Curated annotation (Swiss-Prot):
The gene is rplN. SMART domains: Ribosomal_L14. GO terms for molecular function: large ribosomal subunit rRNA binding; structural constituent of ribosome. Part of the 50S ribosomal subunit. Forms a cluster with proteins L3 and L19. In the 70S ribosome, L14 and L19 interact and together make contacts with the 16S rRNA in bridges B5 and B8. GO terms for cellular component: cytosolic large ribosomal subunit. This is Large ribosomal subunit protein uL14. One of its GO terms (biological process) is translation.
Length: 122
């Protein structure tokens, strides 16, 4: 469950380390985002010579949440930390690698690229 001001890990090699949610997209007063939702983020910490710089604003898709996602069979998939993958304006990943597992809930038309780059799909 991601809301405004939430700090997330960057799960890709775009150059960002930490990003902060500044808006949950999809609806005028939408409060929370879960796995697979698109959010606006500001880069709070970045590595030197990365593709992104501190202070820049990007779209991102949430790939892991500590709250978890409930499956139709009743099971819940949770993670230790919240993480997101940075996207460009065409909603394609900025990085070329994804770090850590992602959930099967990303298997939409939009995020098959992230699924194929991820080392593990839960």
């Amino acid at each position: 469950m991601i809301q405004m001001q939430t700090v997330l890990d960057a799960a890709d090699n775009s150059g960002a380390r930490k990003v902060q949610c500044i808006k949950v997209l999809g609806g005028s007063h939408r409060r929370y985002a879960s796995v697979g939702d698109i959010i606006k983020v500001s880069v709070k910490d970045a590595i030197p010579r990365g593709k992104v710089k501190k202070g820049e604003v990007y779209n991102a898709v949430v790939v892991r949440t500590a709250k978890g996602v409930r499956r139709p069979d009743g099971s819940v998939v949770r993670f230790d930390r919240n993480a997101a993958v940075l996207l460009n304006n065409q909603l394609q990943p900025i990085g070329t690698r994804i770090f850590g597992p992602v959930t099967r809930e990303l298997r939409g038309e939009k995020f098959m690229k992230i699924i194929s780059l991820a080392p593990e799909v839960l």
